[in-house]
Amino acid sequence: MPHNPFSVKTPTFLLSAFLAGALLAASQAAPPDNSREAKAVIQAALADFDAKKYDDALAKLRALDAKMPDDPFVQNLIGAAYTKKKDYAAAQKYFDKSLEKSPDFFPAKFNVGELFFLQRNYPEALKHFRQMQQQDPQNELLQFKAFLCLLQLGNKEEAAKALKGIKYPGDTPAWYYGQAAWASKNGDNKKAIGYVTGAHYIFGPKTALFDETFDDLGINLR
C-alpha cells in the first residue's frame, strides 16, 4: 500500500464506493504527494462524491492525474468516480493503472472485484474476493462480499458456512448485514430490519457501504 504522509479526513466507510465500494476502498490511503494543492483537490473531489456530483469529481481528479500520472491513489479515485457513473470499462482501466503502479494496493484490488459484483457477475466476483481472502482471511469486508456472492448464486449451504465465518462482534457492520441478508433471503424482513437497525445504532456512518450494497441488490429494509 502506498505510503501515507498526510491524512485526508474521510470516513473509513465512505462508500460506496461501494462504495458500491469504491469510496471506501479509495479512502483507506492517501496520495504520496504531500502538497496542499493535492490535498485540497482530493478533499474537494470527495465532497463531490458525497453530493453525487461525479462529473465534477472526475474533472478535478483528471486534472490532478495529469500532474501526478503515477499516483495509484488518484487513479483509484478516478476509477471510483467512473464506477459511480456506471462506466465500468473506464473504471476498470483506472483500477488497472492503479494496480500497475502498486500491485498490492488493497483499495484498487477490492474495486476490481466490486465491478464484477455490480455487473451481477457473481462467479467472477466470488473468485476475486476469495483470492483476496487468501492474503487477508480475517478481513470482514471480504468475508461479507464473498458471502453475498454465494447467496446470490443460490449456494445456501456454502453461504451459511461463510456467514458463520464472519467475526462477531466485529470491527465493521459485516456480521449484522450478513445476518440481515440471510434473513431477507429467507423471507423474514422483520428480523432483517432488526439487524440493520442494530448496525446503525452501533456503527453509525460506517453502515453507508453496506446500505448501498443492499440498495444495489434490491434489498430494501429502510
Identify what each model region corresponds to.
Residues 77, 111, 145-146, 178:
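Canonical tetratricopeptide repeat
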Residues 67, 101-102, 134-135, 166-169, ...:
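Structural marker of alpha-solenoid helical repeat scaffolds
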